[in-house]
């Protein structure tokens, strides 16, 4: 199956996607903080904590949206695309979570996070792969 062509250079496409979707990170963070305000007794944040969360979640959403460009670089194998996509997302999530003190910076916490992240990533990749295979089979049957 041929990959969709990149509309621009991969770098431009990465930044374009990031700019389009980056704002969703702070919106999600705001919704979570709003819910915490009503569910956690005496929930409060410093101005610096809010600033750090807004900037880091924007950058996380930016990177997350842009990283999908790795799957559209036609000269790359699927394995290389997965490796770069996974690695970039992993580093972005770890940095965001550690900077916001949402994840302690110790070996045990990072190990657990890594296992959960890798397992979740593998599960999502499996679901997408099965979905694509089922769609291809259905389309091939329709062509016969």
Language-model region placement:
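Short, charged juxtamembrane terminal tails flanking transmembrane helices
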Residues: 1-4, 137-144
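Non-cytosolic membrane-interface motifs at loop->transmembrane helix junctions
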Residues: 44-50, 80-81, 106-116
């Amino acid at each position: 199956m041929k990959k969709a062509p990149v509309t621009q250079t991969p770098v431009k496409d990465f930044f374009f996607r990031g700019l389009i979707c980056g704002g969703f990170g702070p919106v999600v963070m705001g919704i979570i903080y709003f819910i915490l305000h009503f569910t956690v007794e005496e929930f409060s944040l410093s101005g610096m904590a809010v600033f750090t969360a807004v900037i880091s979640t924007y950058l996380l959403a930016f990177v997350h949206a842009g990283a999908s460009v790795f799957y559209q670089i036609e000269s790359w194998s699927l394995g290389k695309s997965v490796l770069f996509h996974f690695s970039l997302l992993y580093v972005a999530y770890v940095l965001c979570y550690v900077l916001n003190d949402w994840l302690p910076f110790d070996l045990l916490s990072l190990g657990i996070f890594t296992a959960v992240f890798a397992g979740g990533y593998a599960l999502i990749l499996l679901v997408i792969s099965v979905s694509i295979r089922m769609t291809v089979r259905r389309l091939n049957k329709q062509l016969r």
